[in-house]
């Protein structure tokens, strides 16, 4: 509203100022060459720039070094950065992995690429041997014959086990004391003689059958029937009174009559 009232008021008079040329003619403003203004502006600009941003201190010139694979440290050591840590010594000695790269004389020339460090993979024979399972002699199946891949029939026939003299001697000693083995004792003998439990079990079964045959003992699995010739003898021995009656009846009747007369 105030601005509109000023614009609508017709009595407002615009101030009139003389042009700049009159100021220069009346020597209000001294005349200077354009070089003067340029020099002052540049000097003032530099002066303010120096006050706001002081110049950085001069950097010391150090010889440039190119680090190669020799600067690599072990897992327990830390890398050395800058000249401050150059004099620090670690107790562990770092072993260089490859040859250091040559230092370049000029900084403008491109630095050569560091050589590739070819570190061979360490071999651990102990770890490889530990992964392989240990197979004991008693775990090997020596009593099973080799299987033919072209054989399409049933289970291959087992070959006969050939016991050594030492094995047979130990088995005979055990059979002399115990004809029947427990499971625990069978496992102990199998481990000591490098045989399987099945082999020990079968050997003792065969040895018991042989012992019964040598001592002429009847087989407990089959019942023995009485022989046919022994039946009449047993019957005659069981009934002795019947034979006496039969002999008395065989006497003649005349003798019986004579005995009756004498009794009268």
Curated annotation (Swiss-Prot):
Entry keywords, A to Z: Developmental protein, DNA-binding, Homeobox, Nucleus, Transcription, Transcription regulation
Compositionally biased spans, kind Polar residues: 233-254
Presence of the UniProt keyword Transcription regulation in the record: yes
DNA-binding positions: 156-215
Biased composition (Basic and acidic residues): 32-51
InterPro entries linked to this entry: Antp_homeobox_Deformed_sf, HD, HD_metazoa, Homeobox_antennapedia, Homeobox_Antennapedia_CS, Homeobox_CS, Homeodomain-like_sf
Composition-biased stretches (Low complexity): 100-110
Domain of life: Eukaryota
Span list, region Disordered: 19-130, 214-264
GO cellular component: nucleoplasm
MF term (GO), any: RNA polymerase II cis-regulatory region sequence-specific DNA binding
Cell location: Nucleus
Record Gene3D superfamilies: Homeodomain-like (1.10.10.60)
One example of a Gene Ontology biological process annotation: cartilage development
Extent of motif Antp-type hexapeptide: 135-140
Family classification: Belongs to the Antp homeobox family. Deformed subfamily.
Its biological purpose: Sequence-specific transcription factor which is part of a developmental regulatory system that provides cells with specific positional identities on the anterior-posterior axis.
PANTHER family linked to this entry: HOMEOBOX PROTEIN HOX-C4 (PTHR45771:SF9), HOMEOTIC PROTEIN DEFORMED (PTHR45771)
This protein's name: Homeobox protein Hox-C4
Native organism: Mus musculus (Mouse)
């Amino acid at each position: 509203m105030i601005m509109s009232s000023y614009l609508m008021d017709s009595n407002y008079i615009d101030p009139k100022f003389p042009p700049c040329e009159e100021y220069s003619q009346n020597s209000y403003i001294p005349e200077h060459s354009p070089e003067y203004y340029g020099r002052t502006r540049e000097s003032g600009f530099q002066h303010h720039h120096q006050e706001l941003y002081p110049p950085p201190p001069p950097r010391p010139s150090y010889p440039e070094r190119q680090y190669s694979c020799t600067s690599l440290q072990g897992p327990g050591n830390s890398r050395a950065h800058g000249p401050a840590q150059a004099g620090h010594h670690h107790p562990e000695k770092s072993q260089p992995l490859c040859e250091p790269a040559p230092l370049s004389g000029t900084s403008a020339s491109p630095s050569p690429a560091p050589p590739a460090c070819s570190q061979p993979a360490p071999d651990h024979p102990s770890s490889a041997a530990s992964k392989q399972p240990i197979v004991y002699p008693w775990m090997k199946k020596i009593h099973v014959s080799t299987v033919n891949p072209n054989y399409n029939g049933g289970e291959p026939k087992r070959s006969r086990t050939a016991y050594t003299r030492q094995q047979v001697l130990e088995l005979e000693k055990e059979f002399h004391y115990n004809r029947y083995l427990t499971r625990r004792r069978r496992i102990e003998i199998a481990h000591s003689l490098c045989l399987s439990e099945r082999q020990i079990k079968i050997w003792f079964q065969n040895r018991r059958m042989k012992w019964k045959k040598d001592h002429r003992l009847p087989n407990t699995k089959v019942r023995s029937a009485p022989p046919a010739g022994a039946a009449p003898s047993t019957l005659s021995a069981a009934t002795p009174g019947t034979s006496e009656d039969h002999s008395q009846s065989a006497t003649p009747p005349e003798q019986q009559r004579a005995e009756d007369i004498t009794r009268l």
